[in-house]
Amino acid sequence: MLAAQLDSYLADMQMTATPKQKQQLLDFVAMLAKWNKAYNLTSVRDPEQMLIRHIMDSLAASPHLVGERFIDVGTGPGLPGIPLAIMNPDKEFVLLDSLGKRIRFQKQVQFELAIGNISSVESRVEAYQPEEKFDGVLSRAFASIQDMLQWCHHLPKPTGCFYALKGQLSDEEMANMPEGFTLTDVFELKVPRLDEQRHLLRVVKAA
């Protein structure tokens, strides 16, 4: 049932996936549903809704990512980082979260699904100092783009971008970019079977 739905959703989004990638996405949903009962990783309980609200919602950002090295800040159980890593095996993803139970889940997913292009880090974002900066800083965890830029300003390369996955947009929020940052793109995302506004904001540090 879920496999057929995944095929349909990928087709709707004009995405192609190998049989291995499809199985990894489905296995990730199964692990999330199983671990969620004990670890309370997400408020979404139904696997069909997990597929829509977590997997497809994460993948909607995929066509807009530029670069090879990304960090997913406040990733929780690995969202959007793990679905994006599965579908972009040529890119590297660091998954950052401050809660140990979420990191344990991510590492188990990495082990069981043999995902070679993710690494999990347990840290608060302001305390994390990577040896190498990132092409893209991703998050769907922050309430406002201002918060994201304040907490994550030290993470991208000079040529890197911030990617914020958002729902409904506030004109005030978009107009009030912190000093030193420029909003370059607002992408309207279409997620199958999700009748809600979804957007991806791309922000760069001003030169």
Swiss-Prot record:
It is found in: Cytoplasm. GO terms for molecular function: rRNA (guanine-N7-)-methyltransferase activity. Transmembrane segments: none annotated. It catalyses: guanosine(527) in 16S rRNA + S-adenosyl-L-methionine = N(7)-methylguanosine(527) in 16S rRNA + S-adenosyl-L-homocysteine. GO terms for cellular component: cytosol. Keywords: Cytoplasm, Methyltransferase, rRNA processing, S-adenosyl-L-methionine, Transferase. Its EC number is 2.1.1.170. S-adenosyl-L-methionine binds at residues 74, 79, 125-126, 140. Belongs to the methyltransferase superfamily. RNA methyltransferase RsmG family. Specifically methylates the N7 position of guanine in position 527 of 16S rRNA. This is Ribosomal RNA small subunit methyltransferase G. It comes from Shewanella loihica (strain ATCC BAA-1088 / PV-4). The gene is rsmG.
